[in-house]
Amino acid sequence: MEDAEVVLRRAPLFDGLDEESARALRRQMSDVKLSRGEHLFLEGQDGDRLYVVLDGKIKLTRAAADGRENLLTVLGPGEMFGELSLFDPRPRTSSASAVTDATVAALGHDALRPWLLERPEVSMHMLQALARRLRRANDVTADLVFTDVPGRVAKNLLDLAERFGEQDRDGLHVHHDLTQEELAQLVGASRETVNKALADFAARGWLQISARSVLILDIERLRRRAR
């Protein structure tokens, strides 16, 4: 497990702060430990704080009209979430729960607002993070319309590999910690269709499939399939 202070410095909230300011802001935060499957907040609840993942993985989900759960994203150490309610104080638009045992650092909006007023650069970094998230959401929407399921599977595996992959001489190990159903939700397709795509990739020698992880053997082929 990485040192919490090192992880926090990767978050947009701390980007650009000097050491003294970063320590002062850290003192305003409280740590929350979650067991696997435990909810941090639910869609529709009022939001009064943002969070940074210190350890483990957090997933953000949203309920569909028919009651099914849609997996929006999986977040790892250094990634921030829950900040939307700071700029738009309406109920939460998603639920957050632990994919693995996890620890997050929480910062209340009342403690954060003075920092944003005194340090416009912090506000700018947070807005840039929101812009990146919006751009990603637009890409996901476009993929659902224009990209076939195998292409979306490849693209999501590459995204997970970029954030959670560990390279060794065997290949790129991606411990995503997702069930088959969760991976299908992330892709936006049925579990059967996603499993068929994964089996095809494995048969071609591009990857090996394990429980809640994959070993990528030919990342270039996977990149071409994601285009």
Residues covered by each model-derived region:
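Cyclic nucleotide-binding regulatory module and flanking cytosolic helices
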Residues: 1-36, 85-86
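Long cytosolic regulatory regions associated with cyclic-nucleotide signaling
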Residues: 1-6, 19-22, 84, 91, ...
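Cyclic nucleotide-binding regulatory domains
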Residues: 13, 38-101
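Short aromatic/basic micro-patch
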Residues: 16, 50, 74, 106, ...
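A generic structural signal for short hydrophobic patches within well-formed alpha-helices
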Residues: 22, 112-113, 222
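Amphipathic, well-packed alpha-helical segments that form the structural scaffold of globular domains
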Residues: 26, 30, 128-131, 135, ...
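Cyclic-nucleotide recognition modules
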Residues: 73-135
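Phosphate-/nucleic-acid-contacting segments
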Residues: 149, 156-227
